[in-house]
Regions:
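Residue-level detector of beta-strand face positions
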Residues: 100, 118, 247-249
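Short, well-structured hydrophobic secondary-structure segments
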Residues: 48-84, 187-232
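Glycine-rich, low-complexity intrinsically disordered segments
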Residues: 2-115, 122-165
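Non-transmembrane, aqueous-exposed alpha-helical and coiled segments at domain scale
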Residues: 165-185, 196-298
């Protein structure tokens, strides 16, 4: 892979003569059940990366890491545009356009993409990964270990760019975010994700929940992890509190939102002990009762 001459402005080529010699050597290829980019789910599917034999030595000691960054060359991408309308943005006007360096669109001058993935297992030169959003046959240009000490920035925030396609899409996104923080998908985590999904879709019109204060049951550790992750509340900043009652409370602007467990006589922990798939399958009216109250200034 070399940079095509017609993609290099003449003034840039004269000032930086080395730029035309930039070369990317594919080190492997993606093997995925999805071959059409239009059919790829937002968060990808289980896939594998086959490293070419001549790069096998580069995999030595990769087993020390649970997650990796996969850098790929999006060979089907449009390299001619610098402005795009991101997924989820309904405004087709100039106001809806974003620069390609401000979004994760495959459209960009150098279509290098990166995705973090969990290593399920390594078989020879084949990496089996929990999910990749690259289509079958995508060239891989690099593999790097994911380091918690330098790659995880828990204080990072992003202004919302687009609107989730629907409630299910939002729930899937929240579950993945919470699982990345907590380490596994359990009942308590799923319960927390369902509460936050309802809160955002019903009361916030799908907007992000950053800046929300939360009060959570003190004995529901997995649910606490979900709420911390998904609304950005923490004890250290005074935005996360605890109590002994079976309900979650969100406080935002001039309103209070209560989520009360709908199973009288049962402890909250008995719900969170259920498997995640059970929590996700139950109708929300069987899990909680939600209400919103205006807080009047005194």
């Amino acid at each position: 892979m070399t940079m095509p001459p017609d993609a290099i402005p003449k003034n840039v080529a004269s000032e930086r003569p080395w730029i035309g010699a930039m070369v990317l050597t594919p080190i492997g290829v993606v093997r995925s059940p999805i071959a059409d980019r239009q059919e790829m789910p937002t968060f990808g599917v289980p896939a594998r990366v086959e490293i070419f034999p001549e790069f096998a030595d580069g995999l030595r000691h990769l087993h020390k890491h649970t997650h990796v960054w996969i850098l790929a060359w999006l060979h089907e991408a449009d390299r001619t545009r610098l402005l795009v309308t991101p997924r989820g943005v309904s405004d087709p006007s100039e106001a809806g356009l974003h620069g390609v360096f401000a979004v994760r669109s495959p459209t960009r001058p150098n279509p290098i993409a990166l995705t973090a993935a969990r290593i399920e297992r390594i078989e020879g030169t084949c990496l089996h990964l929990d999910r990749l959003d690259f289509v079958d046959g995508t060239p891989v240009v690099d593999v790097k270990p994911y380091f918690r000490s330098r790659d995880a920035i828990y204080a990072a925030r992003n202004e919302q760019i687009g609107r989730p396609a629907n409630r299910q899409a939002l729930l899937e996104s929240l579950l993945l975010q919470a699982e990345h923080f907590h380490g596994e998908r359990c009942g308590g985590l799923a319960f927390g994700a369902r509460i936050v999904e309802h809160f955002r879709s019903t009361f916030l019109d799908f907007a992000e929940a950053w800046g929300t204060h939360a009060i959570v049951p003190e004995d529901a550790g997995c649910l606490i992890d979900a709420v911390m992750t998904l609304v950005g509340a923490t004890p250290g900043r005074g935005t996360l509190g605890f109590h002994g009652a079976p309900f979650v409370r969100f406080i935002r602007d001039d309103r209070v939102y209560n989520y009360v467990l709908l199973e009288p006589g049962r402890r909250w922990s008995s719900w969170t002990a259920l498997p995640a798939d059970v929590i996700l399958a139950l109708p929300e009216e069987e899990l909680f009762r939600a209400s919103s109250t205006l807080v009047r200034a005194k």
